[in-house]
Amino acid sequence: MRTKLKITEGIFPMPVLMVATYNEDDSVNVMNAAWGTMQERDTVALNLTEIHKTVQNIKARGAFTVSIADAAHIVEADYFGVESGNKVADKFARSGLTASKAETVDAPVINEFPICLECRFIEYQNNEYGCGVIGKVVNVTADESVIVDGKIDMSKVNAIAFDPYTHGYYKVTERVGEAFRDGLKLKK
């Protein structure tokens, strides 16, 4: 038997993405965004409203970075979602994390998060189905601690996912299958 539930953003897992920009004074701003995905291999889509300080910064600078949050920094990642850059100018400084300038875009890389996508702002879309930032990924970097044989080993990243049903975070660490291979067992 199935139970009927209220409608919510019910896709799981939802990524916990750290979207980083520079403010007007060159200080770092970061927000926590769960509504994000890849549109193509090199295009990021983030469902963010224009009231966010981060969106204002993206439009002004033409760039942003997207990092994948990890379990070791759950407190900081959550803080970036509960505190507004419009209200707290030194939000990033209060986190205790550090940043460096991205190699290819005018945006910061949060050093403590293991994977970072450097993005060039393409456009802001606003229509009946939602609104958001579209960016072109121009560089991807990863901390050496998560690299095995020249590739990212997601079991070492300890990425976290947002649970929209109970508003919790879960660690995403165990590989359970081989994409585009396991299903071939049923193909006739």
Please place each PLM-identified region on the residue numbering.
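Basic, polyanion-binding surface patches
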Residues: 1-188
